[in-house]
Amino acid sequence: GLPDHIAWIKAAGEKYPYMDMDRVGIYGCSAGGQESTTAVLLHPEFYKAAYSACGCHDNRMDKIWWNELWLGYPVGDQYKEGSNVENAHLLNRPLMLVVGELDDNVDPTSTMQVVNALIKANKDFELVVIPGAHHTMGEDFGEHKRYDFFVRHLQGGIPPEWNAITYR
């Protein structure tokens, strides 16, 4: 889980001093999208920004057979405690949520539920919906968005003007 990831990254930072432990971002898709959101909600002291694509943000609404493998049966408090919807009010780090309009693996409603909870909690975040896309990290457009997001929030820089870039 995330505590193990944090311990590993800190150990790597000790071995490789060029790693900046004050600017750690995280991204993921599907279960990784869920976990990257969880990272900034529950471990904001370590993770400074998250790009989360197509995550199932509440395991009570996903494929229950899949979740029972990891969280057990019956559906109990462990499902609620791990819900990004329930924990949305904790957000205090930059978060970009990305979802494919036609995702047939993780229902886009899962992302919209966390969006609704963030709005109700008056939290600032970014949302990118990719029209016509399925279960995706964001395709080419999402790659630009992810790059720009981390340049802004981890480097404090200004992303390039993508439309002005020419290739030889």
PLM regions and their residue ranges:
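Active-site-proximal cap/loop segments of hydrolase catalytic domains
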Residues: 1-168
